[in-house]
């Protein structure tokens, strides 16, 4: 079964890594389906039933986004609030439709990895900063598989650095 990659980037056309990752996934259409939230909902009016039906079709789901302001783009929070509803995602006999689905995060972080340490400039690890995602996935009984992060694009946006991100990203998706 294919993996659904939900891309949440407000300006993917001007992105560096996320745009490259999407291009790579397009090469493997037999393994991955890409769903871009900002392209699907430019006015940010989410079709909740369509999103729920989409999620129900997959056993493996990855949310891909740039990490800025120490979180995800706002449309992802809105998506969680509107799509992961009581009675569907949790809390009743018919709930937990996401239960047991393998879920992961694919994150691009402009800042270097060593800055996301207790001794770095931001004092917290990326694992600590993404804890709300893990808690959400645990609450809806999904099988959270952690995250893949690629750091440092702000300091190094060379073609070599970008291409270096692709094999481990695809390997992360394959291993989900």
PLM feature spans:
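A short beta-strand-loop structural module common to alpha/beta enzyme folds
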Residues: 31-44
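Residue-level detector of anion-binding/catalytic polar loops
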Residues: 31, 61, 143
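Generic recognition of short, well-ordered alpha-helical segments
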Residues: 16-20, 46, 74-78, 160
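Glycine-rich, highly charged phosphate/nucleotide-binding loops
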Residues: 42-58, 165-168
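N-terminal beta1-alpha1 ligand-phosphate binding loop
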Residues: 1-32, 165, 169-170
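Helix-loop-strand module that forms the ligand-binding subsite of alpha/beta enzymes
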Residues: 49-134
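Structural beta-sheet core signal
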Residues: 5, 34, 63, 103-107, ...
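Glycine-rich phosphate/pyrophosphate-binding loop and the adjoining helix
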Residues: 22, 26, 130-176
